[in-house]
């Protein structure tokens, strides 16, 4: 079973994006840039994203064994803020959008608390949002959660990516927030225990502090890619078409091997298909000079490979 069989057609989505790309030169980026003041070189960066069908699994876990939905709030914030980091920006504030057929007080308060906690973690305010009851548009008990954020660009641009630069992968906390349309299809046929369900629902890592630590240690960041839908191929969105990555390890899994191997075994996806669908243990890729590897101030990363010319 592949992602398309599960109901998600990435190739079609890419094709549609190409068709509308003439409408804006911002399409295809992790977040959109807006020049606020050309003279002062002040740019804003904005992003919008959601948690996707992971919410359905989280709702099921709450109904089954009273698992809190706070983690979904963190997922929402992380999906947006991690994208803003890829555009060399510092987040300023966050807004949420929650829609449902009928409001459930417990669900609502838990999700909002998770959003607030995640905003506090990255030191930004939750300044508002929208809550919509939409009877007839959702099945009973369903919820959709999206987020919006604005950041300000750092004054110093990323340095140019060069041949020989290293690509490091900062580890994920698990599956994060993509691939769940496929995961949910698998769970219908192959139910898992509560422990494995908890692993699947582990909230998306917020990488704000990792990037902040790299900057504080004067590590020259050349490019950042958030590994979500599209998996490892997302790094191509921030690289020139003249270069590519030579990966050091043929093994597709870097962390959380048990849960990703379970997905692969049950879905029969190839290694390449897995890396183009799931994060496989890497939630964010960062390109740095090889000489600065020793200056990375945290340990939860792997050296994935180096930048080489396209053949």
Regions found by a protein language model. Give the residues of each.
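Short secondary-structure boundary/capping elements
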Residues: 72-79, 203-206, 255
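Glycine-rich phosphate/pyrophosphate-binding loop regions near the starts of catalytic domains
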Residues: 20-173
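Short, glycine-/Ser/Thr-/acidic-enriched flexible segments
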Residues: 52, 150-154, 173-175, 229-230, ...
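Short, compositionally biased
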Residues: 180-191
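A short secondary-structure junction signal
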Residues: 158-159, 178-182
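Glycine-/charge-enriched secondary-structure boundary and capping motifs
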Residues: 2-7, 16, 22, 65, ...
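Active-site loop/lid in soluble adenylation, ligation, and acyl-transfer enzymes
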Residues: 13
């Amino acid at each position: 079973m592949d992602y398309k069989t599960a109901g998600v057609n990435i190739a079609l989505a890419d094709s549609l994006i190409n068709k509308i790309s003439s409408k804006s030169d911002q399409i295809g980026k992790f977040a959109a840039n807006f020049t606020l003041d050309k003279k002062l070189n002040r740019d804003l960066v904005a992003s919008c994203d959601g948690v996707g069908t992971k919410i359905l699994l989280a709702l099921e876990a709450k109904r089954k064994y009273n698992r809190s939905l706070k983690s979904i709030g963190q997922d929402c914030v992380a999906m947006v803020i991690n994208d803003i980091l890829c555009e060399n920006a510092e987040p300023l504030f966050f807004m949420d959008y929650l829609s449902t057929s009928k409001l459930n007080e417990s669900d609502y308060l838990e999700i909002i608390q998770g959003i607030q906690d995640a905003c506090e973690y990255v030191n930004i305010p939750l300044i508002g949002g929208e809550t919509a009851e939409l009877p007839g548009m959702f099945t009973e008990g369903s919820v959709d959660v999206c987020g919006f954020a604005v950041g300000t660009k750092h004054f110093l641009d990323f340095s140019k990516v060069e041949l020989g630069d290293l690509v490091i992968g900062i580890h994920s906390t698990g599956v994060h927030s993509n691939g769940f349309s496929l995961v949910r299809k698998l769970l219908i046929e192959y139910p898992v225990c509560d422990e494995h369900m908890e692993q699947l629902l582990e909230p998306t890592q917020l990488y704000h502090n990792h990037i902040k630590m790299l900057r504080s240690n004067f590590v020259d960041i050349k490019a950042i890619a958030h590994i979500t839908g599209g998996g490892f191929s997302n790094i191509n969105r921030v690289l020139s078409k003249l270069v590519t990555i030579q990966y050091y390890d043929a093994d597709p899994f870097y962390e959380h091997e048990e849960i990703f191997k379970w997905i692969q075994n049950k879905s029969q996806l190839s290694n390449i298909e897995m890396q183009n669908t799931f994060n496989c243990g890497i939630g964010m890729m960062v390109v740095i000079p090889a000489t600065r590897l020793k200056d990375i101030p945290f340990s939860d990363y792997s050296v994935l490979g180096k930048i080489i010319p396209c053949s």
